UniProtKB/Swiss-Prot annotation:
The N-terminal domain is essential for RNAP assembly and basal transcription, whereas the C-terminal domain is involved in interaction with transcriptional regulators and with upstream promoter elements. Coiled coil: none annotated. This is DNA-directed RNA polymerase subunit alpha. GO terms for cellular component: cytoplasm; DNA-directed RNA polymerase complex. It comes from Campylobacter jejuni subsp. doylei (strain ATCC BAA-1458 / RM4099 / 269.97).
Length: 337
């Protein structure tokens, strides 16, 4: 039976199963009913559209006027050569967003992706076939390889070409070959009404599936950040997360859990100290200044607090002091009510 709640459960489980260098299964759970597809579908779209990759954007072949031309000594016509070329998956070796690369082949030869590897670019699908030339052929071409996202048709690329001898190419930048998701039922705290999202990501080898998934997440965060300018949701979420983390520590437990001597406990109780976190928030001088707290009790409290990982006056709470203070005040108000 589902309990009445005032907010959706935040998933806590996440796994990545690397099936190969180019395939991974990414799972997260438990989601409330309906939340799985709400998040999985846009992530899938972003995997295709926002993941950065490389592609040839233009080519000039010596002796060739246009893509429907033919070339002496090459088995393929130029159109088929370009189709094969677009199947090659390039990586630029430098930090540059663009490389102009020259290639030259002579004599009888079958040309594969591995034959285009040089100091500027790498072809990740090395065994992909490109062309066959005979002993009379001299195949010389210049290729522009660029970094980008998504897909840009040749008509748009043509507008940016300054050299008319280059043939514009359809540019398939995305390194994600396939992204699919499944929404599975999952049992959580004896409740079967939760969902598990399983994303299967396949890349072409330019990047790993994990890198592609990270890129998609970053793109989603950036797109949603425009709404945060007014709502300040990220700050609220951070504070809520920190509050949840505090609840999982000893800081919000009663000082009775410290097993103090009766003298030390009675002194703290009379001073109004209820929670362990109050001791962590105090400085040593503040603690020593409590009425009737002797040196023996002071040393006892200091030693016990050090043993649980939160020494008196600890700096570990630097960013969370106000959150802890507010949480303790809230708990005290509830107890008084």
């Amino acid at each position: 039976m589902r309990n009445i709640t005032i907010s959706a459960y935040t998933p806590t489980e996440f796994t990545i199963e690397n099936i190969s260098d180019t395939v991974a299964k990414i799972s997260a759970w438990p989601f409330e009913i309906g939340y799985g597809i709400t998040l999985a579908h846009p992530l899938r779209r972003l995997l295709y559209t926002s993941t950065v990759g490389y592609a040839p954007t233009a080519i000039h072949i010596d002796g060739v006027a246009h893509e429907f031309d033919s070339m002496r000594g090459m088995l393929e016509d130029v159109a088929l050569f370009i189709i094969n070329l677009k199947k090659l998956r390039f990586k630029i070796k430098s930090d540059s967003n663009k490389e102009i690369v020259e290639f030259s082949f002579k004599g009888s030869k079958e040309i594969y992706g591995k034959d285009l590897n040089n100091d500027q670019v790498e072809v990740v699908n090395k065994d992909a076939y490109l062309a066959t030339i005979n002993e009379d052929a001299e195949l010389e071409f210049t290729l522009i390889v660029e970094k980008g996202i998504g897909y840009i048709p040749s008509e748009e690329i043509k507008e940016f070409l300054n050299d008319p001898k280059f043939i514009a190419l359809d540019a398939f930048f995305t390194p994600v070959r396939e992204a699919t998701y499944d929404i599975e039922k999952v049992l959580f705290e004896d409740n079967p009404d939760y969902e598990k999202v399983v994303l299967t990501v396949t890349t072409d080898g330019q990047i790993t599936p994990n890198e592609a998934f990270q890129n998609a997440l970053e793109a989603m965060y950036k797109q949603l950040s425009v709404f945060d300018k007014i709502t300040n949701v990220r700050s609220v979420i951070k504070n809520q997360a920190t509050s949840n983390e505090l609840e999982n520590t000893k800081l919000l437990q009663n000082i009775t859990d410290l097993n103090l001597s009766a003298r030390s406990y009675n002194c703290l109780e009379k001073a109004g100290v209820v929670y362990i976190g109050e001791l962590a928030l105090m400085s040593v001088s503040e603690l020593a200044g409590l009425k009737n707290l002797g040196k023996k009790s002071l040393d006892e409290i200091k030693n016990i607090m050090e043993n649980i990982g939160f020494p008196v006056g600890t700096s570990k709470l630097s960013d969370n002091k106000e959150i802890l203070k507010n949480k303790i005040a809230e708990l005290k108000a509830q107890n008084e009510g």
